[in-house]
Amino acid sequence: MTSNKRSIKTNSFIHFGCWNNGLCDKNEGTNSVSKVMNKLNKYARKNINFISIAGDNYYPKKIKKEKSEKKEKGEKSEKSKKSEKKEGDKIKMIHTNELVSGFNCLPNNVEINMILGNHDLETNTRNKQQLYVDDITKMEDMNNCFILNSEIKEAVNKNINFVLQKTYELSKNTLIIMIDTSMYEDDAINYIPCYNEYFQINGVIDVPITNIIELQKLQRENILHKLEELKKTYSNIIIIGHHPITGWKEKNDNNILINPSIEFIELLMDIYENHQSSKYYYLCADLHLYQQGTIKIDDKMVIEQHIVGTGGAELDTAIRVEPGKTINPDMNILTYEMKQNISTNGFLHCIENGKQICFKFIDIMNDTIIKNNCNSNSFDRYSRKSKSSKKSK
């Protein structure tokens, strides 16, 4: 007997960030990034559309610069003194072999869309000089963007697309908008040299960017122009960035709620004004944990946010907040209700079935799956048995 049920195509992708930390060996490595890559490569054999990596694609090692036993005789000029790092200060060492190993650990059988985090845009500037390359005597040249250039080099001839901003359809029901969020940071001016390096390599613009406001304006115009070009309505809009809109974190033994960027909130509201009937999801990283919650902006735009900075970086402490408690950051138009907060490594599996979106966090440390909105039987083919699996609604 032939079934009259209409089959619904299922699309899915994997999302995480904050990952390339230390030497990666996906087969025998015991550090966090190796374990995540081992699991990811096995999981990527499933029928997924692509992998979204939300930045911080390499972490230089923080080390303390040893004090020299003897100082050179003679007085140095004030200008010379100011330009040097103070002895005993912490510096950041780029280990090229570790950076390369991480990119070689990524799955090679599926498209990877990779955005930039703040660590990818780090370089020595006139005001901040702390990056060294492979040796304590080799300081990175000013405005050299060694990390970014090395990452782009590793992506060449691989299945990796570096994305500063991109808008595309997962299906007729779901739109994905990948956004650069580092330009909304307070110290984003320090990233201008590497933004221009990226633009030059990719032939994006002819004239170098000179200020961050100009860059924010360019991104906003590109996104809104693409939305106008599409002229469609979507059941779901998934926005992907590096930084959370807001979220709970621990800092100096205090529980801190991240203050949102006003400029970024304005961009989100501009997107919302074009698609008010859509369901909104925001996937990001930056905090080294898995945190899920609901954000409401101006009592209009409701966003389900997933912070997934769990790809291999040293983990942050997951603070405890009263379940269901809604908090206002220092911005009256926004509220945040945290629902999940776990300090662990893993990645998020995002599944679309028809007009529904389901999220499954694959926790590799505890060997569990944390489910969000996955109540329908239509998502069962992506499930696996786990005695300790957790479920949230």
Short names for language-model regions:
Residues A54, L230-E250:
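Short acidic, glycine-rich surface-loop motifs adjacent to enzyme active sites
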